[in-house]
Amino acid sequence: MKVAFVQDWFNANGGAEKVAGAILDIYDKDAVTIYALFDRFPPSARMEILKGKPVKVSVLQYVPFICKIYRYFLPVMPWLMKRFNLKGYDLIISTSHAVAKGFRSDPGTLNICYCHTPLRPIWDMYDDYAASHPMGKSFLYSAFVNYLRKWDVASSKRVHYFIANSIHIQQRIKKSYGRESTVIYPPVRVDKFALNDAERKDYYLCVGRVVPYKKMDMVIRAFRQMPDKKLIVIGTGWGAKDFNELVKGCPNIEWYGYRSDEDMIRYIQEARACIFAAKEDFGIMCVEVQACGTPVLALDYGGYRETVIDGVSGYLFPEQTEQCVADAVTKLEQQPLNNHIAIRQNALRFSEERFRKEFSDFVQNAMKTFYK
């Protein structure tokens, strides 16, 4: 069986890339051809996720500093994706949070899309992106978004089966595309993120990619107002340029930038709690933290409502404000969550083994129905 696998792009070893790796593990490496708009994986991630397999790319691969500026190429991404020739395959699987489902293929080839989210800048987060764009209030920006919405809906009609990464995204797929979908939660490395008998230390942790929507800067500002509480921040990304200034003069806040997986896991295992303030559609890192038996303080939004048991594995706070973060910290101080076994138990329902079985069963059933 010839399989094509399509990803928006490969530039960081994040949640979407971990899903890609778990799907690719299901199929014979030699039977799968991988497509992406560009591939700038570091060598370690290339071996972990792609097992060293090459990726067919677009001209964006040759744009200098593409990892930092790729979002500015959104207007041409649909056109570039359509230039991939995905003919002659028995099965096409895409994992998309942007344009990966927009390729052209034989209509008689089964097309399955694992959707992380409909394209955020033109749907649920349109107002946020427009407010931050210098032309966000212009007629041209509005016209461009309308064009992308029409293209996005049209490309969704070429998908035979949608898989949603959460109930939250299932609802958004229905709202944006008018399509039904099946929920299969992403795979979480619950074996790698293990419970540890090490003594918990008196610090809070904020970890992840440093991009604006993660709101890590807001968490830092919250702890600037709590000088008696220690915060450790781990992560890199194009949004980190202001972090040095934010933590200056705050001895209770430490920003470590990049750390290896081994170091990061140790920090998670020893933390009092980990804080997640982003609007996440699922949030794999939040589940990885719970797999270590560490409680989380997370925004009451999206995937966190499905992955956090409020009052058992963490506390949900209502709004993206510094005060809400501070209130959540105070609540944990007054009502500690120390049943680390129960916290880990909650994470085990999102294991990689569970994902591979659910995904394989879904594809097999879809192929039987489609090719009967």
List each language-model region with its residue ranges:
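Active-site donor-binding segments of glycosyltransferases and PAPS-dependent sulfotransferases
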Residues: 29-101
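Membrane-proximal helix-turn-helix segments that form the acceptor-binding/catalytic region
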Residues: 131-162, 170
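Conserved donor-binding/catalytic core segment of Leloir-type glycosyltransferases
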Residues: 194-214, 220-228, 232-234
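Nucleotide-activated donor-binding/catalytic signature segment of Leloir-type glycosyltransferases, i.e.
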Residues: 241-265
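Acidic donor-binding loop of glycosyltransferase active sites
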Residues: 269-281, 294
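Short hydrophobic beta-strand element within catalytic cores of glycosyltransferases
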Residues: 295-299, 308
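Conserved acidic donor-binding segment of nucleotide-sugar-dependent glycosyltransferases
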Residues: 310-311, 315-322, 330-337
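A charged, aromatic-enriched C-terminal amphipathic alpha-helix characteristic of glycosyltransferases
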Residues: 320, 333-372
